């Protein structure tokens, strides 16, 4: 068995021994769906019941903000959460600054909601990482709708102040495929008189569209043109929401079982929404042995059990319209590439530079420390795979996906690795290291 220890200074020590991974796992609830269930539940009339919610730092930030806005949300847990909604346009003006923590989803989607709360004033901030992340991509189209938003660097950085206004519908051609931009505008459009149309260059994840329709919004999607239209004003009704497991969390185990010989894992109840399954398409292209079992539809979302067995991986190219479907999985795919035969090329991923860390730089730096041959490009990486990695001192940059990706790399490296600032994993997967200790 691998030796995995958690030290008092927020460090994971991982000494690998090549032991195969075996077992059945249930990954935590989908983070994107969990955020949206809390938000729509707070804006809807009546009660929303949520099963399978992710209880992580990001979703706790969303719950905290909406409690400050007057919504009644029961203590967060994965079994059952109840949200007593206030109804459209009835969120209350809080008496203090709201803090989105590290959660870009919380801040960007909240901007769309708050901009439409006529006559009420809000201030929104976050941690140091979030305050450095770009908000203009959401603020700019909201200003076109009539929003009043102020902030640092020409209203592009938090803290941000919002004075709710009567908004107008718009037609917006987004320069990037971003579910956060699209969702913020849809949440604002719920309060307008008329039809808002949003077109993207590629499809982005569509959890907002699916859930808005379930809550009663008049929304249509043209997949051929990557266009969404919403007719406002809307009246949302509370719903029962079952949150599937997060494929972004499952990705770590899919790669781990693929690269560690003689491994086999069954990941149950994982969301396989086609706007999120780029990770599967890439791993299949690399030769991974992954099968979908017990496929079904749960509250409007495709769900399956994923069985993964170890396989000999080969290099591939990742870019173009694939990127929005796996943007969060690129760090762990880079780990897979380090163990694959040949050179894997990642392109069109400049968005990774403005995530919780500069993930292109972080991935290149840390894998190079382990002996991988990685070339950092402006919008991607070239990774020469096939060589053994060596355990060493590694840094997460306070980024949850970096912490877990490096842990999987360390699990198949020679010697001992120390991963510093590892508690960042709690943002999306608080139980990750416990599960790692159990199966490794």
From Swiss-Prot:
Alphabetical list of CDD domains matching this protein: EPSP_synthase
The keyword Calcium belongs to this UniProt entry's keyword annotation: no
At the top level, the lineage of the source is Bacteria
Which Pfam families does this chain map to? EPSP_synthase (PF00275)
InterPro entries registered for this protein in UniProt = Enolpyruvate_Tfrase_dom (IPR001986), Enolpyruvate_Tfrase_sf (IPR036968), EPSP_synthase (IPR006264), EPSP_synthase_CS (IPR023193), RNA3'P_cycl/enolpyr_Trfase_a/b (IPR013792)
Name the EC number(s). Answer: 2.5.1.19
Which reactions is this enzyme annotated as catalysing? 3-phosphoshikimate + phosphoenolpyruvate = 5-O-(1-carboxyvinyl)-3-phosphoshikimate + phosphate
Q: Which GO terms describe its molecular function?
A: 3-phosphoshikimate 1-carboxyvinyltransferase activity
Q: What is its main location?
A: cytoplasm
User: Where along this sequence does the record place binding of phosphoenolpyruvate?
Assistant: 31, 104, 133, 180, 359, 401
Q: What class of enzyme is it?
A: transferase
Q: Name one GO biological process term.
A: chorismate biosynthetic process
Annotated catalytic residues: 328
Q: In which pathway does it act?
A: Metabolic intermediate biosynthesis; chorismate biosynthesis; chorismate from D-erythrose 4-phosphate and phosphoenolpyruvate: step 6/7
> Where is it localised?
Cytoplasm
Chloroplast keyword on record = no
Provide the residue positions that the database annotates as binding 3-phosphoshikimate.
31-32, 36, 178, 180, 328, 355
The entry's cellular-component GO terms read: cytoplasm
Keywords, sorted A to Z? Amino-acid biosynthesis, Aromatic amino acid biosynthesis, Cytoplasm, Transferase
Subunit notes for this chain?
Monomer.
- Cite the HAMAP family for this sequence: EPSP_synth (MF_00210)
Q: NCBIfam families annotated for this entry? A: aroA
Biological function: Catalyzes the transfer of the enolpyruvyl moiety of phosphoenolpyruvate (PEP) to the 5-hydroxyl of shikimate-3-phosphate (S3P) to produce enolpyruvyl shikimate-3-phosphate and inorganic phosphate.
Q: What protein family is recorded?
A: Belongs to the EPSP synthase family.
What is the name of this protein?
3-phosphoshikimate 1-carboxyvinyltransferase
The protein's organism comes out as Thermosynechococcus vestitus (strain NIES-2133 / IAM M-273 / BP-1)
Q: What gene is this protein translated from?
A: aroA
